[in-house]
Amino acid sequence: IPYSTLEEYWHSFNNVYVLVYPPDKEPTVRDILGDHWDVETNRQLALDKYQAQIQSNPEDAFAWFNLGTNLVYFEHYQEAAQAYDRARELGLPQRMLRYQFGPFFAYFHTRRIDDLMALTEYALQITPNAEEALLWQGWGYYRAGDTNSAIASFQAALAENSNYLDAQYALDFVR
């Protein structure tokens, strides 16, 4: 596919990439990536990129979503929640919460439990067995003081994926 098409589709995934290379090629890969080799620098450059994209196109929902994702990485949850709010206002495809969970983190850490629960309900309507959405639903219940429902959600997440360590941690934490 042409690079322009790849770039267009990749945009909705925060331009995340995974490096796969033989260990003896690490110096070459480091040279190719330059400043992007360092994870913190890479994330800061991504944050800067999406801030600039929003300046040039404030109606780009993916840029707002990606800004939120990078703000979550730096634990700037309040700003991240605001970026996700804007992305949601502009409209996102249903699939956005299948593999990207930044909004759950942002709303949880800003104690916006109603928003967290609304998002998890939305995600579970699309994919009823999504263990990540079940996990965050459980954390929402926990923050709301409903420990029994939290445990049920964490157990449901583990029923979907018995190796889901985050759900096991959550279950152990609330018990």
Explain the meaning of each model-derived region.
Residues 149-175:
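Terminal, low-structured helical/coil segments at or just beyond the last alpha-helical repeat
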Residues 69-75, 85-139:
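Alpha-helical adaptor scaffolds
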Residues 1-70, 74, 79, 85-87:
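Noncatalytic regulatory segments and standalone regulatory/sensor domains
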Residues 51-55, 81, 88-89, 124, ...:
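A conserved position within tetratricopeptide repeats
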